[in-house]
Amino acid sequence: MTEHDNGADEGLEAADADEPRIVQVHGEHGETIYAMDADHDNVADAAAYDDDNDGVIDRIAIDTDGDGLLETELRDLDGDGRIDAVFVDTDGDGHKDVAVLDTDGDGQFDRVIVDTDGDGRIDTDIRDTNHDGKADYVARDEDGDGRRDYVVTDSDHDGTFDTVHYDDPKNNPLAQA
């Protein structure tokens, strides 16, 4: 491979025209990026990043909807070589608005946080606190002030939400009945 003036390396040649083309480039911060063009339109369909050039891929970005934007990103946040976070830009505005996380490094995703209204703030927080694959905690900020307006929990982990906490009694539909 030869390096070009723009920092891009010559692409690795695919065995035939149906195989993806992979190009190695160096990012503006010195990281190594492997970009894959699966459909030969000269737009990356996926990219793998070695952010610290230690030979281990730290994150992968994927264009999951074919629009030319790498809206889905998988990351190894703790450096153990396993993906423990998935970030998605669901509305195409260039900002990730959904995160799925493995918060304790056990290989199971146990938290989902979402910006449902696109204001850049998390307004929905869903957690699996006992690692059974089911949500045990859901918090929601309805008015965009950055504070939870209500929290619903399954405190005894039987699969049924049994506790509801409203931050403001005037938003509690049970108090208004």
Q: What are the language-model segments listed below?
A:
Residues 1-177:
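Calcium-binding acidic motifs and repeat modules
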